């Protein structure tokens, strides 16, 4: 069985948010003010997540990424990854801010995690604190080092570039990739911040990032699957390390999108910028059979949006910020 939408796109990737809680308050994601987290009984339990993962697997989902919030703040995430491994999920990955990674990396590998993305938006400790509103720079850097010495190497490091904040670090990040032999990915700033300060002038286009790095260290493109979000590049001089450019604002890839999201409170989102959540949790808790769940998921995915519409004049950002959607 396979999931398709009305535009003929096959859905093979699922982002699973296991918590809406996070120990960071990144400026492009969360408000500086206290936020109302979901009550614990509103969040999908591990048994519910186990069951839903199995249902999605029968629908042809091959890749599952564990996200948050910050997934490592929820106890039991290693056991959940083990469950995904036991389901024979083809690709199991995680996105994390890296704060708890050094102490959890070995357990994650043992559980069956295959790939990891670590958020790092500055190589300057003071600026890092300004962006994340934490003093966790040393912990994150240590986590990256631990990953690079593990079976998860090479790790992927994600930087969201915001004009006037960290756009002066592009070349430093590229040098970091070369020094650590890791995959450095630059992501355009999207209108998903809780304070709704996003505007197009804050976006650093992927083309600008490419030109700046290429002028310093010539790059050559690496072939990629049409549904991948990142354009990938290696260094022509053969130095280990890789550059990835993710350009949802200036070079949308919606036409080849293969992803849907399951939020921590059990809602399906067919796009990061969906205006509507589809309530899987209520159906689950009302005693739906697996067949009922399959029917509902199939109908929801069939109506997946054509695209995010960021570049349309009538675009409005979603009411949920990134931390409540899941990365």
Regions found by a protein language model. Name each.
Residues 25, 29, 126, 131, ...:
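Residues that scaffold the ATP/ADP-binding catalytic core of kinase and kinase-like folds
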Residues 1-13, 179, 189-192, 196-327:
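Auxiliary Fe-S-binding modules of radical SAM enzymes
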Residues 43-66, 70-187:
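Radical SAM/AdoMet-radical enzyme domain recognition
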Residues 6-47, 58:
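Canonical Radical SAM [4Fe-4S] cluster-binding loop centered on the CxxxCxxC motif
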Residues 24, 125-126, 252, 278:
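Glycine-centered loop/turn positions within well-structured domains
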Residues 34-39, 124-131, 193-197, 279-280:
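A short acidic, helix-capping loop that chelates divalent metal ions and anchors anionic groups
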Residues 18, 184, 266:
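Residue-level signature of catalytic and energy-coupling elements of molecular machines
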């Amino acid at each position: 069985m396979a999931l398709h939408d009305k535009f003929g796109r096959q859905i093979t990737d699922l982002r699973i948010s296991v918590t809406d809680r996070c120990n960071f308050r990144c400026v492009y994601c969360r408000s500086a003010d206290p936020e109302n987290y979901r009550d614990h009984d509103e969040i999908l339990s591990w048994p519910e997540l186990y069951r839903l993962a199995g249902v999605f697997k029968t629908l042809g989902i091959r890749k599952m990424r564990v996200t948050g919030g910050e997934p490592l703040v929820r106890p039991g995430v290693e056991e959940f990854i083990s469950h995904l491994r036991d389901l024979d999920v083809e690709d199991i990955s995680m996105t994390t801010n890296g704060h708890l990674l050094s102490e959890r990396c070995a357990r994650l590998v043992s559980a069956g995690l295959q790939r990891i993305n670590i958020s790092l938006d500055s190589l300057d400790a003071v600026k890092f604190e300004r962006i994340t509103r934490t003093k966790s720079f040393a912990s994150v850097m240590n986590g990256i080092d631990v990953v690079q010495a593990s079976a998860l190497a090479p790790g992927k490091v994600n930087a969201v570039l915001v004009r006037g904040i960290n756009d002066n670090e592009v070349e430093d990040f590229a040098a970091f990739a070369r020094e650590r032999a890791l995959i450095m990915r630059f992501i355009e700033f999207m209108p998903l911040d809780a304070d709704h300060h996003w505007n197009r002038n804050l976006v650093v286009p992927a083309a600008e990032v490419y030109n700046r790095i290429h002028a310093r260290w010539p790059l050559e493109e690496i072939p990629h699957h049409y549904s991948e979000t990142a354009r990938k590049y290696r260094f022509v001089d053969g130095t280990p390390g890789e550059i990835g450019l993710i350009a949802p604002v200036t070079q949308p890839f919606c036409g080849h999108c293969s992803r849907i999201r399951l939020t921590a409170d059990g809602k399906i989102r067919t796009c990061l910028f969906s205006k509507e959540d589809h309530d899987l949790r209520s159906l689950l808790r009302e005693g739906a059979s697996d067949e009922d769940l399959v029917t509902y998921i199939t109908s929801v995915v069939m109506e997946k949006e054509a695209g995010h519409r960021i570049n349309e004049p009538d675009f409005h950002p979603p009411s949920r910020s990134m931390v409540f959607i899941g990365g």
